[in-house]
Regions:
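Intrinsically disordered, low-complexity regions enriched in Pro/Ser/Thr/Gly and acidic residues
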Residues: 140, 147-149
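Catalytic and substrate-binding regions of extracellular carbohydrate-active enzymes
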Residues: 1-133, 142, 152-167, 175-188
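PEST-like, low-complexity acidic/proline-rich intrinsically disordered segments
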Residues: 148, 168-170
Length: 188
């Protein structure tokens, strides 16, 4: 049975090295379980100065507790050399949980409210003179087995399973980045 720790919030199995405390020095980083991943494969090319693609595959199993048997992520960044669509990023996760009944959920955080249209999620960044845009198209799971939820907005910035857990001592967004909280997509 799944056990919830850390203030009754489902951490998704994420492991917290050194008891969740920041490391004070390099010795702590090297000795207290901070290694959370390993590169399995990588490639880029064909031009080494301006590659058309970059491929990376990693094993991130060590970043999680016993809830996860295996987690590997592969991604390919494509330089499309286009002003309208400069790049594409393809991400493929292979995850095996220790309990097949655990619900697997992929999170995508955003500062501004995301928009959902079928299997497409659009996220923009227009405040503070930004003009970024990302369109996420979900290929797996198939649309007939896909659930996409949008969570966030006032009073739901840190909402987990229906309960908002507001952060304590957030920096003033007028003087710092406003990237904490806001919105996320849960895809399962």
């Amino acid at each position: 049975e799944e056990q919830i720790r850390r203030n009754d919030v489902n951490d998704g199995g994420q492991r917290f090295p050194n008891g969740g405390n920041e490391p004070a020095n390099i010795d702590i980083i090297l000795t207290r379980g901070y290694k959370v991943g390993e590169i399995l494969a990588r490639h880029f090319g064909p031009d080494s100065i301006k590659p058309e693609y970059t491929y990376l595959k990693g094993d991130l199993t060590q970043a999680y507790t016993g809830k996860i048997k295996q987690f590997q992520r592969s991604f390919v960044f494509l330089n499309l050399d286009s002003k309208e669509h400069p790049a594409a990023l393809i991400v493929f996760d292979r995850l095996t949980s220790s309990n097949q009944d655990f619900r697997k959920t992929w999170l995508l955080h955003s500062i501004e409210e995301p928009f959902i249209d079928g299997i497409n999620i659009t996220i923009t960044r227009s405040r503070k003179d930004y003009n970024g845009k990302m369109i996420n198209t979900t290929l797996f799971p198939a649309s007939d087995n896909l659930l996409i939820k949008k969570i966030g907005g006032t009073g739901h910035e840190f909402d987990v399973m229906g309960t908002n857990h507001p952060a304590i001592n957030l920096p003033d967004p007028a003087t710092t980045s406003d990237e904490s909280g806001s919105w996320r997509i849960e895809l399962s």
